[in-house]
């Protein structure tokens, strides 16, 4: 219990009106004397003076609104009648200083905060949570507004075309023209003492009149999220879809090849909803060439935009790699289309001429044998050209699947030949679809903020991990082992793998070779579906993902996922079966384990495959 203080001591501890500066700073009890007792005890009596307090700003209470310091203005944009998207309502609060009462003084600063509301047409009175889209602080500048002057809605500042958060669900071409217009507008001098009135310019203003009908369809399905991160993510995913046909008004034109033209007897349960991506690859280049000739000089402007906005170091441009000029999709021209695919495909040697910095894995291992050599020769390491790697990969897959369909034409039974031909085509479509739908969106989201130095660090991490895996292969010398990049390029092959398959070491490591060249069609299709769905970026619910794979598996004989595969708890390895190509042209059934190695960005950089042959007893 606290001891009661005598009355004399209570008088000395009684609070006073104003304390000295020292007692105020130290938060101790001061007295009315000057100097006070606390300052005398510390021999600082000559510095004892009253603490000056700031004067309170009192607002004169008049009954009129114009004398308030806080001015609110609600501006509703006039939205065209053809659009059904939610209208944009902008609430601007101008926090003016109290110098309206004292015009003789110079104001310190002026702060403008603009909020954006999305209000449904059916509920004009209901508001949503505001989000700040622009925050401007102008020092040494005052915007004095007279509330008696009413500002009409046509003079309001429209932020629907704000370049920070552009409107989504638009084509890549329209977004480019929109950003170019905004960039030119930002270069013009702005007024200093007033808000510049702008008109509600649609996003499609840069397009021709012939495309207005298509733009109206886009406006009807316009979606504007309440989060700038959702808008940014949606635009990235939209670019993946629009990158195939950036100059086509309707993406459905590239899918003119219907399921009825290529009937698949074993895939009848899927109906005609399957998209033939092989024809997409063959027709994209020719259609874009026709569009380029009509657009003319505007294409160079868009290329300039790409250099500013796009990410220059990361690319998955797998849909513009076809050099064929024929995009005819009639069934009678299938043989001509396939011959053009074979004639237009480039060999690995021709593709490597475009990459002057290419070093084969065997030559690189001669330079770098230890981790110390890796860091000593770090100046020789450059980011790997994955764009060229995916170009070679697409050429290899088309050569493997489409040439396989041509070879099977010599079969004795015509029905069996036709079924096998369609299965191979469908397998290639399943592979490309799994890359575009499963792998590409996650990969783009993970690499959106990477710079060139990050790619260099990723390559150094890959080479350092490769050295550790090679040392492990020497310890576990009884298992045939092969290591490849996420693009399928082989980086290391153990001696046991050479003994198992019978291939020469120089054949695999002295050039760009892919692991898919040494697997059959069924194993390649299984690998891409399992890798893109489960192995590349990990998985959470194993049973759910496994069931999803089984349901989405192709119904053709050569594309069914092997039922006997299992997972590890950490999501880095999968056990399954495959058919490995031997040097004599035959395939050997093997049990394999695919283990992925990821970097700090959770991006797969290496895949290690271990193979054990399965000998069946007669």
Swiss-Prot record:
Residues 335-352 have a biased composition (Basic and acidic residues). One of its GO terms (biological process) is regulation of transcription by RNA polymerase II. Residues 466-538 form the PAS domain. GO terms for cellular component: nucleus. Residues 20-48 bind DNA. It comes from the Eukaryota. Signal peptide: none annotated. GO terms for molecular function: DNA-binding transcription factor activity; DNA-binding transcription factor activity, RNA polymerase II-specific; RNA polymerase II transcription regulatory region sequence-specific DNA binding; sequence-specific DNA binding; zinc ion binding. It is found in: Nucleus. Keywords: DNA-binding, Metal-binding, Nucleus, Sporulation, Transcription, Transcription regulation, Zinc. Residues 325-352 are annotated as: Disordered. Coiled coil: none annotated. Pfam families: PAS_13, Zn_clus. Transcription factor which regulates nonfermentable carbon utilization. Binds specifically to 5'-CGGN(8)CGG-3' and 5'-CGGN(9)CGG-3' sequences in the promoter region. Belongs to the ERT1/acuK family. This is Glucose starvation modulator protein 1. It comes from Saccharomyces cerevisiae (strain ATCC 204508 / S288c). The lineage of its organism: Eukaryota, Fungi, Dikarya, Ascomycota, Saccharomycotina.
């Amino acid at each position: 219990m606290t001891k009661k203080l005598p009355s004399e001591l209570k008088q000395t501890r009684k609070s006073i009106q104003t304390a000295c500066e020292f007692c105020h700073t130290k938060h101790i009890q001061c007295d009315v004397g000057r100097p006070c007792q606390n300052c005398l005890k510390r021999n600082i009596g000559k510095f004892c003076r009253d603490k000056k307090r700031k004067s309170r700003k009192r607002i004169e209470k008049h009954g009129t609104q114009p004398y308030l310091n806080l001015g609110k203005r609600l501006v509703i944009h006039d939205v065209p009648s053809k659009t059904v998207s939610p209208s944009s309502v902008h609430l601007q609060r101008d926090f003016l200083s109290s110098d309206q009462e004292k015009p003789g003084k110079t104001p310190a600063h002026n702060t403008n905060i603009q909020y954006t509301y999305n209000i449904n047409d059916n509920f004009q009175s209901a508001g949503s949570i505001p989000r700040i889209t622009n925050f401007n602080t102008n020092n040494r500048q005052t915007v004095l507004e007279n509330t008696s002057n009413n500002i009409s809605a046509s003079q309001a500042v429209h932020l629907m075309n704000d370049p920070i958060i552009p409107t989504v669900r638009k084509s890549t071409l329209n977004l480019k023209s929109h950003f170019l217009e905004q960039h030119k507008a930002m270069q013009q001098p702005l007024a200093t003492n007033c808000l510049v009135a702008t008109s509600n310019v649609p996003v499609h203003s840069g397009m021709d009149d012939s495309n207005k009908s298509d733009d109206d369809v886009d406006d009807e399905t316009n979606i504007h999220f309440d989060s700038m991160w959702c808008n940014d993510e949606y635009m990235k995913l939209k670019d993946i879809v629009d990158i195939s046909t950036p100059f086509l008004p309707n993406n459905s034109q590239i899918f003119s090849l219907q399921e009825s033209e290529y009937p698949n007897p074993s895939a009848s349960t899927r109906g005609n909803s399957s998209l033939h991506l092989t024809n997409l690859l063959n027709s994209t280049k020719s259609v874009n060439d026709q569009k380029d000739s009509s657009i003319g000089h505007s294409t160079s402007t868009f290329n300039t935009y790409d250099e500013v906005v796009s990410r220059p170091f990361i690319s998955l441009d797998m849909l513009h790699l076809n050099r064929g000029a024929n995009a005819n999709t009639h069934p009678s021209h299938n043989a001509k289309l396939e011959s053009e695919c074979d004639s237009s495909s480039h060999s690995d040697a021709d593709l490597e001429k475009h990459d002057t910095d290419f070093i084969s894995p065997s030559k690189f291992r001669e330079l770098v044998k230890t981790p110390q050599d890796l860091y000593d020769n770090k100046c020789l390491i450059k980011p790997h050209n994955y764009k060229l790697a995916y170009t070679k990969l697409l050429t290899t897959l088309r050569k493997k699947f489409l040439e396989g369909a041509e070879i099977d034409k010599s079969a004795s039974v015509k029905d069996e030949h036709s079924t096998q031909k369609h299965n191979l085509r469908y397998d290639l479509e399943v592979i490309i679809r799994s890359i575009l739908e499963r792998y590409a969106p996650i990969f783009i989201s993970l690499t959106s903020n990477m710079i060139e130095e990050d790619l260099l660090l990723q390559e150094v991490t890959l080479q350092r991990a490769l050295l550790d895996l090679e040392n492990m292969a020497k310890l576990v010398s009884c298992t045939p082992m092969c290591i490849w990049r996420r693009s399928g390029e082989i980086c290391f092959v153990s001696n046991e793998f050479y003994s198992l398959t019978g291939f020469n070491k120089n054949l695999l490591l002295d050039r760009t070779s892919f692991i898919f060249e040494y697997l059959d069609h069924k194993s390649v299709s299984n690998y891409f579906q399992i890798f893109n769905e489960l192995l590349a970026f990990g998985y959470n619910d194993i049973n759910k993902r496994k069931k999803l794979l089984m349901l989405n598996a192709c119904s053709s004989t050569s594309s069914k996922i092997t039922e006997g595969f299992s997972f590890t708890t950490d999501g880095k390895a999968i056990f399954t079966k495959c058919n490995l190509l031997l040097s004599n042209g035959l395939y050997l059934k093997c049990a394999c384990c695919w283990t992925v190695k990821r970097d700090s960005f959770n991006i797969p950089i290496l895949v290690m495959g271990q193979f054990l042959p399965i000998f069946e007893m007669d």
